[in-house]
Amino acid sequence: MELHKRKNIRLKEYNYTQNGWYFVTICTNNRRPYFGEIINNVVVLNEYGNKIEKIIKDYNDVSTDVINDFYQIMPNHIHIIIRLVTTGKHNIGSIVSGLKSKCTKELKIKDLWQKNYYERVVRDQKEYDSIVKYIVENPFGDKYYW
């Protein structure tokens, strides 16, 4: 019996410890709306969502090499722009893994997250601005592609 092998969705040959901005989306397992709800196009966080927000904000107080530049907590996923200030010191994969682990421990929900995460290397200011617009408009359900 052959087991399903997950496809690697990362860029080949890319150094994910390189300084710069990374747009990351982390989804809850089975897209369960653990963090709140959308009411009149506004995300209303519940207790879990507020705990997630505190964890994200606290991360900026812990490290000056990794900055959570911009984020939006949705009912069943998180959008976050992570900025690595120093090349070689941190890896996006380990940062996301640490964030997922801390949230899981704090919320005490087994299988809180999907196994993987989505990321996009932000290449320039125009793309950064488009991603911020997408994140801000996400509660409205609009499709926006950069």
Task: Show which residues each predicted segment covers.
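Short catalytic/metal-binding and nucleic-acid-binding patches
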Residues: 1-146
